[in-house]
Amino acid sequence: MIPICPVVSFTYVPSRLGEDAKMATGNYFGFTHGAGAQYSQQPAAGVAYTHPTTVASYTVHQAPVAAHTVAAAYAPTAATVAVARPAPVAVAAAANAAAFGGYQPAHAATDYGYAQRQPEVPPPPPPVTSQNYQDSYSYVRSTAPAVAYDSKQYYQQPAATPAVAAAAAQPQPTVAESYYQTAPKTGYSQGATPYTQTQQTRQVTVVKPATPSPATSTFSIYPVSSAVQPVAAAAAASVVPSYSQSPTYSTNAVTYSGTSYSGYEAAVYSAASSYYQQQQQQQKQAAVAAAATAAWTGSTFTKKTPFQNKTLKPKQPPKPPQIHYCDVCKISCAGPQTYKEHLEGQKHKKKEAALKVSQSSSSSSGGGSSARGTQNQLRCELCDVSCTGADAYAAHIRGAKHQKVVKLHTKLGKPIPSTEPSVVSQSSTSSTAAPNKTSSSNINSSTSTSSNASSSVSASYLKSGSMAASAAQGKSSGANNVSVNSSSIKKVNTPKINFVGGNKLQTTASKSDESKADAAKTAQSAASAPAADAKNDMPDPMSPQSALAALQSDVQPVGHDYVEEVRNDEGKVIRFHCKLCECSFNDPNAKEMHLKGRRHRLQYKKKVNPDLQVEVKPSIRARKIQEEKMRKQMQKEEYWRRREEEERWRMEMRRYEEDMYWRRMEEEQHHWEDRRRMPDGGYPQGPPGPPGLLGVRPGMPIPQPQGPVPPRRPDSSDDRYVMTKHAAIYPSEDELQAIQKIVSITERALKLVSDIITDQDAGASAKGKEEDKEKKEPPKDRLLKGVMRVGVLAKGLLLRGDKEVNLVLLCSEKPTKNLLTRIVEHLPKQLTMVTPEKYEVKGSIQESAIILTSCGDPKMQVTITLTSPIIREESSRDGDVTSSMVKDPADVLDRQKCLDALAALRHAKWFQARANGLQSCVIVIRILRDLCQRVPTWSAFPSWAMELLVEKAISSASGPMSPGDALRRVFECISSGILLSGAPGLIDPCEKNPTDTLAFMEEQQREDITSSAQFALRLLAFRQIHKVLGMDPLPQMNSRFNVRNTRKRRRDNSDGADGFEAEGKKDKKDYEGF
């Protein structure tokens, strides 16, 4: 007869997912009775996985016996001999306690809370775990340390052999405690007493899952140390329980595997299924071994293997609680959503980018040099901040921010560095590189049974709660009594923030690993020494002790008497007030720091003791102001240089175009002269067009009279006359060079005068304030802002004989007589510095100008008019001249002259933008300017109105026009009566309000110019343009009139006089006005 054995039931029911945020907020780990704990541990590659809302479902095989569920989220390795009770085992123990009577343990610490609730859904009946036992037995739960949870792959582990179970029969609390260490002891630890139960009767009944049987048990739970590497195959969905009878009883481990997964890749399915089949074979072998063991101990009841053909029911896996901690920002988040939003936030990204930049700069410099401005600074490794002095560092250590970080790291079990400051220098940076790397590699070393654990490469700052809770250093004396049985030791990437503490970080590695780490540290420090010595150009680094002493002893506090205490009604000091700096503070330490500060010392030197030595420390703002000033000066010099080059290029292009035109005219004249000398004389069907600039192309036959090429329209007679007149009135090369020379000299001399006046004004206003230069606002604009070319000089309309040009000097304030006098005084001295030639300078208050005249030949004159944009802004703002005149200084210059100078500036800009690029426009304007100077009738025509009229007439044409046609079109416009009073007039495009440019002309002057234009148009129609231009007639280029019609003319005109000459004699009295 087979005896009925008691059945030990382990029931895991998935807990609700909604309480994660609450538990993670206060570092609260809620392990509910009868529910599976939720874990998320960082894998070997430094990657943490979090469970989604819909977790994978587990399907457990059914067995025909009693209903007991074993569904854990950890698969310990069977090869580990160490007997311990990690956090997952504690959870299983809590579940077992709930099944056996609702055991509620008493806690030594308040960090963990347990709550018991009944499972909402009855669990499905899984296979039974049955054992044979004696009357008196010891019940010890034995499992390998489950230290990792991989949510992507689930593998079955081989069943524990009887030898392992027998070895696990004896409790070993000392070894377990030495293996799992915790510095702050955030978990709880009770006496590890074996569970003993004496049965009075041999009849036992099957325990139902919903009906707990009375039992008492004592458990010993040790927090898991994060120093152990996560196992690669630690994702199996089963727990390997091991029970030992005292002294002759041991059972096989039972494994259950789920075969239904959701939300994972197909590769994981195939890997899990193949591994599952292998484990089923191992289960069969384990069952045979169990039968043999039972026979050896006198028992005849063996464990039945689970059936593979039963229907599988899905069961959701447990989801462990997570602690969301960001290593970069050193903060914890309430939940996954908050943590995700933090990672996507700007603050985190900025800190991460700054960290990467600092790491790259330190790595590029060989790890031995720091950035500029960080030398001799005290650094807090925990908060990753640098302080400029010992007082600032002490205030930071006492501050709320540092204390908050310390509290958070204490909760998470992270190592807290020593509060002793580390001086940021070349030697300290290189010395901390090796310990960081070694300690981090030791922390992340652990057993590994598969290479799949390194398949993830994404970075994450999420740390597991179980891992973070036990990452501190241990206090046990037997810390190194456990050796780690590992197939390979892997090193993961070091975290982005390395904690370098004052004490050595203790890990669970063996002594050999520690010796290797020390050797690596020595080798790396030795390797960094020649790298530092290789940089000969770098100064020798100051030792941390000397730098710290220098920071502490350099500055002595001054001005204690000027800091008064402010007390409340009870006489208690509530704050301090500095009368020198007009500031308040409520911390005595801040008072000492303020008395040593540079701001207070500067105020003390300014108001109390001028002899106090204060180091000159150029601030970032002062340096930026200086750089901005230099940049503006370079830009201004570049602007003037480019402007001179553009002006030179414009003049050269204009001369080049005129030379090309005249070359073509000469070639055409030679061509027609050659044709006129030919014996046949002329062409029967009209002359063809003249050849190009290079003559007839080689190989091209000369056109025959019977089939000539369609002729190109030659330049008309009017074009020849206009271009000949333009060449006559164009300035010579000597005149152009003389004008360019005197203008350039004047501009450079005015620049020097502007510098002198600016320095004088700045020196007068800065007396007694030299110590506050770096705190001042940027200096105001200089009084003389710049000089601009205006009039015919800027427009390129100079004529032969023009000796006067105009410049405009812009001022930042309204120009006054005093300013004009100062410029006249300084300008002659600066002219001698620019050029050795003699120039005469005189000021004209009536014209609001300075007149500069050259003493050598040719005599040139430059008129420099002073003006300011403020004058036009005020007039446009209020429109009342009298009101603005009241505010002006007493010696302000003539307002209208200044406004005319501003208008000349706008006219020059408009002309360069609109008229300069228009074909034949500049030539026609020069012809009309010459006409206004020769003919008194046209002298009343304003030059600005004439420029507007020519530009409008030429730009409104359908296409480009030759000079003769353009001149004819302008005369046609004037002849149409556009200048008369009833006409629309010419509106000034450079004024805000509609302004007629012809408003200054009288009615008689308008009619005279209109009549003269009509008469000139008649002369152009009768081929007498030379009379309008005031030049002699050019020789006839086309001889066909003389050759073909000579005889006919002689017969009709017996006196021998030419028809054009006779007509010219009759009309001589009509064009005498031109």
From Swiss-Prot:
The keyword DNA-binding applies. Residues 767-781, 1062-1074 have a biased composition (Basic and acidic residues). GO terms for cellular component: cytoplasm; nucleus. The lineage of its organism: Eukaryota, Metazoa, Chordata, Craniata, Vertebrata. Residues 697-1073 form the DZF domain. Residues 417-456, 520-533 have a biased composition (Low complexity). Its main location: nucleus. It is found in: Nucleus; Cytoplasm. Residues 344-374, 412-456, 508-545, 697-718, 761-781, 1036-1074 are annotated as: Disordered. PROSITE patterns: DZF, ZINC_FINGER_C2H2_1. GO terms for molecular function: DNA binding; double-stranded RNA binding; single-stranded RNA binding; zinc ion binding. The gene is zfr. The keyword Lyase does not apply. Residues 700-711 have a biased composition (Pro residues). Involved in postimplantation and gastrulation stages of development. Binds to DNA and RNA. InterPro entries: DZF_dom, DZF_dom_C, DZF_dom_N, Matrin/U1-like-C_Znf_C2H2, NT_sf, Znf_C2H2_sf, Znf_C2H2_type. This is Zinc finger RNA-binding protein. Pfam families: DZF_C, DZF_N, zf-met. Keywords: Cytoplasm, Developmental protein, DNA-binding, Nucleus, Repeat, RNA-binding.
